[in-house]
From Swiss-Prot:
Name the record gives this protein: Kappa-stichotoxin-Shd5a
Bridged cysteine pairs (disulfide): 42-74, 51-67, 56-71
Organism of origin: Stichodactyla haddoni (Saddle carpet anemone)
PROSITE patterns found in the cross-reference section: SHKT (PS51670)
Keywords: Cleavage on pair of basic residues, Disulfide bond, Ion channel impairing toxin, Nematocyst, Neurotoxin, Potassium channel impairing toxin, Secreted, Signal, Toxin, Voltage-gated potassium channel impairing toxin
């Protein structure tokens, strides 16, 4: 009887460890995906004072097809 109780407790502990590990891995995947979306998101327009030809050519908004040019009036 004592062995069955110990086995049941160990089984429950193992199941909890599996559930916690799965949740942590899922959270890591979500964090990576959210970070990727944040990196791909468009930045606000660059102020006219900082607007250079290099920034127009290499800005995030210019390179991504779904974004408008950052420096529209360079």
């Amino acid at each position: 009887m004592k062995f069955q109780v110990i086995a049941a407790v160990l089984l429950i502990a193992f199941c909890l460890c599996v559930v916690v590990t799965a949740r942590m891995e899922l959270q890591d995947v979500e964090d990576v995906e959210n970070g990727f979306q944040k990196r791909r998101s468009c930045i606000d327009t660059i102020p006219q004072s900082r607007c250079t030809a290099f920034q127009c050519k290499h800005s995030m908004k210019y390179r991504l097809s779904f974004c408008r040019k950052t420096c529209g009036t360079c």
